[in-house]
Amino acid sequence: MKPVANSQSSINNAVQHAGSSSSVLDLSGEWIGYYRGHYDQVVRITQSGDEVVAVKVTGDDHVPAGEVTFRASLKTLSGEGQVAEKEFRNPCFVPGKLAIMSRERISFSWENCGTVEFRKDD
């Protein structure tokens, strides 16, 4: 996944220089992501100030619908993503990183667990 340089640069600048990035970059809404080994899944992102939380609308054998899949800070792009064994056993959060390619494309990388790219679902 290759970021679009101009979009990435302007979005990063807006996030870094805004007092509240929520007025500059709003990621709220439904996003579609392909979780490797599963299928396309829909997540709903809510945003409060500089914090975003993604909750699964459609789930899988590991993290079901209604559960948080990741949360992150727009200021640092650091966050944590939820992982679990099949049937949602032993769920836990691991460190992760949010990446913003454009207003319509983001990704989240779970430490040692892979990356999911999301596209805005209009």
Where do the protein language model's features map onto the residues?
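Soluble ligand-binding/transfer domains with enclosed cavities or grooves
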Residues: 1-122
